[in-house]
Every structure is written in structure tokens, then in C-alpha cells.
Design a protein with these regions (language model features):
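Surface-exposed polar/charged interaction patches
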Residues: 10, 14-17, 46, 50, ...
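Amphipathic protein-protein interaction modules
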Residues: 103-153
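Acidic, proline/glycine-rich low-complexity IDRs
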Residues: 2-3, 137-189
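Extended intrinsically disordered, low-complexity coil regions enriched in Ser, Thr, Gly, Ala
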Residues: 57-59, 69-97, 143-163
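N-terminal "first-domain core" detector
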Residues: 20-86
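Negatively charged, low-complexity tracts enriched in Asp/Glu with abundant Ser/Thr
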Residues: 32-36, 89-107
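Low-complexity, charge- and small-residue-enriched intrinsically disordered regions
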Residues: 2-23
Length: 189
């Protein structure tokens, strides 16, 4: 992605006469950190899409919140949904949703963590321990924050992160318009 961005930027510069045509094609370099981040952004979006599909699609929920735990041998997801102005855990939903999340989404956690973090390992940067993702159906906006092994939040247990963020979400949900198009606060230490 970085290469194409540079290429198109250079084409614009050449069209304006700012650089010569010989300088249009940038040197091709592989930025492993950028590639890892790009892959993570794709995975964030896929996780949110699957979380929303699991409950019946965007018409079934107002917002979806996904927490990931990518710590070795602890990989899992925690999901919350805003429905009719109320924040619900996926465990509080009807049996078909609980079954779908338990049997289809949660078993993917270890593979998702491995796929994402092997890219960061290859780039020789801190790997993701936790992430907090949010999706707003009214605007189709999504947001995410990752916590790597270098983040102070990595020292938290997953339960501490889940309960801390849920407390923030429960406080924010009643006061946030459905089309706010901005992220809820994240839990931080």
C-alpha cells in the first residue's frame, strides 16, 4: 500500500512539474511494520463484520464492541452490543446468537492472533496483546485501539480490561447519539 501511495503521489507531483518523469517510480521497499499494520486493519474490520453478522447484521444492533485477547494460550474475544439503547454481553443474548459466537467466532481467536502477530514478529516490533474495537451501524464507522507488549495495558488481566471498558461503555451509551461517528473512550491505565 505504501508503494502505491508514493507512486500516485509522485504522478501528481510530475503532473505539476515538481519532479521529473524519471522520478515517478519510487524505489520498491518492503516496510514490514506498515504491512503488519495494514494486515491488522483488515483483520479489525473482519472481526467487526463477523461480530455484527453473528447477531443478525447491522439492522439487529446499534453498535458492536469487540475486545481481543492475543496473549499466548489465552486467545479469545469478548463482545458487547448496544441494542435499543442497552449494552449487552453476547452471553445475554438469545441462544442462537450465543451458540453462533461460541461455536463459530470464538474458536477463531487463536488463529487470528497467530496470523496478526506473526507479521509483527517478522517486523521485529512489539506484538498485540489486547485490542478494543468498535462499530457504529448508523454511520458504518469503526474504530480500534491496540495494546502491544510495550503498552502499560498489557500488564492487565483480560478480565480487568473487559470490566474496565464495559464500565466506560455503560456510562457512555445513554449519552451518545447513534450517529456520533466518533469512538467511545477506551480503557487505559
Amino acid at each position: 500500500m505504501g508503494f502505491l501511495k508514493k507512486l500516485f503521489g509522485n504522478i501528481e507531483k510530475a503532473n505539476k512539474g515538481e519532479i521529473s518523469t524519471e522520478e515517478i517510480v519510487p524505489p520498491f521497499t518492503v516496510d514490514l511494520v506498515e504491512e503488519a499494520d495494514d494486515y491488522w486493519r483488515q483483520m479489525e474490520e473482519n472481526l467487526l463484520i463477523n461480530a455484527v453478522k453473528a447477531v443478525g447484521g447491522p439492522e439487529a444492533v446499534e453498535r458492536a464492541f469487540v475486545l481481543t485477547n492475543f496473549k499466548k494460550n489465552q486467545e479469545t474475544f469478548e463482545l458487547f452490543y448496544q441494542m435499543d439503547g442497552q449494552l449487552l454481553s453476547w452471553r445475554e443474548m438469545d441462544a442462537s446468537v450465543v451458540d453462533k459466537i461460541s461455536n463459530q467466532l470464538l474458536p477463531q481467536a487463536a488463529e487470528v492472533a497467530r496470523a496478526v502477530n506473526e507479521n509483527y514478529e517478522e517486523a521485529n516490533v512489539p506484538v498485540i496483546q489486547y485490542a478494543m474495537l468498535q462499530f457504529e451501524t448508523a454511520t458504518m464507522a469503526w474504530f480500534g485501539r491496540k495494546h502491544t507488549t510495550a503498552s502499560p495495558e498489557a500488564k492487565l488481566t483480560f478480565e480487568e480490561l473487559v470490566s474496565g471498558w464495559r464500565a466506560i461503555l455503560e456510562k457512555e451509551v445513554p449519552n451518545r447519539p447513534l450517529d456520533s461517528d466518533r469512538p467511545f473512550p477506551y480503557y487505559e491505565v
